[in-house]
């Protein structure tokens, strides 16, 4: 399943990020890609050795960790270090699949269950640059407001179409979920959403408590910690 997570960054945060990224040192995006991806990748990424990068990636991690909807949808166990990319002048990233595992500075290795893109450019400021994701439900074309995030299974083939006008800037990362199976994770997310909706309409009740108990027992049964 694909999820739109709005308002991960405020407009003020986005503006500050963009101002700082204007001062960043950008390098060839293929430095973080395997042999297959390098054949179809043509973009730029912020140099991960810079002090600015270290500060910005920490801010992204803090923002997603504090976002309740992101947590409910992803049920994250491990987050990769966020990266930042830029597309302009017809740069693109052809169809590819993300690697199943990635190195992690604290945990050694992590499994990539989910991929996330946090948009940092207003969609009206550039042409092209759509994230195209192919999954079992068909093809999805994504171009979200700045500050919003899209979350989708890392097993999906996906690409970024050529940016023919303006500049597309984003942050991206991978998540190892406590729930490995996409279908089980989606069921838990739907159950959680319905519990929250019922609580907002009717307040606390024995029935809602029973559903909450069911949610946590399923999470206990399925989670890998």
From Swiss-Prot:
It is an enzyme of class 1 (oxidoreductase). GO terms for molecular function: 2-oxoglutarate-dependent dioxygenase activity; iron ion binding; L-ascorbic acid binding. GO terms for biological process: DNA damage response; intracellular iron ion homeostasis. It comes from the Bacteria. Fe cation binds at residues 96, 98, 158. Its EC number is 1.14.11.-. PROSITE patterns: FE2OG_OXY (PS51471). 2-oxoglutarate binds at residue 168. HAMAP family: Hydroxyl_YbiX. This is PKHD-type hydroxylase YbiX. It comes from Escherichia coli O127:H6 (strain E2348/69 / EPEC).
């Amino acid at each position: 399943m694909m999820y739109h997570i709005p308002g991960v960054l405020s407009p003020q945060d986005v503006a500050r990020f963009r101002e700082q990224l204007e001062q960043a040192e950008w390098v060839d995006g293929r430095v973080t890609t395997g042999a297959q991806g390098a054949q179809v990748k043509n973009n730029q990424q912020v140099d991960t050795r810079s002090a600015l990068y270290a500060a910005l990636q920490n801010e992204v991690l803090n923002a997603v960790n504090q976002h309740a909807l992101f947590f409910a949808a992803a049920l994250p166990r491990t987050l990769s270090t966020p990266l930042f990319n830029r597309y302009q002048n017809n740069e693109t990233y052809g169809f590819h699949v993300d690697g199943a595992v990635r190195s992690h500075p604290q945990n050694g290795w992590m499994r990539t269950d989910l991929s996330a893109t946090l948009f940092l450019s207003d969609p009206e400021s550039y042409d092209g640059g759509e994230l195209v994701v192919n999954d079992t439900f068909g093809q999805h074309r994504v171009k979200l407001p700045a500050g919003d995030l899209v979350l989708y299974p890392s097993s999906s083939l996906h690409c970024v179409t050529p940016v023919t006008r303006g500049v597309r800037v984003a942050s991206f990362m991978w998540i190892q979920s406590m729930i490995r199976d996409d279908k089980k994770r989606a069921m838990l997310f739907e159950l959680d959403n319905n519990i929250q909706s019922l609580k907002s309409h009717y307040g606390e009740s024995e029935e809602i408590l029973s559903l909450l108990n069911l949610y946590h027992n399923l999470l206990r049964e399925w989670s890998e910690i």
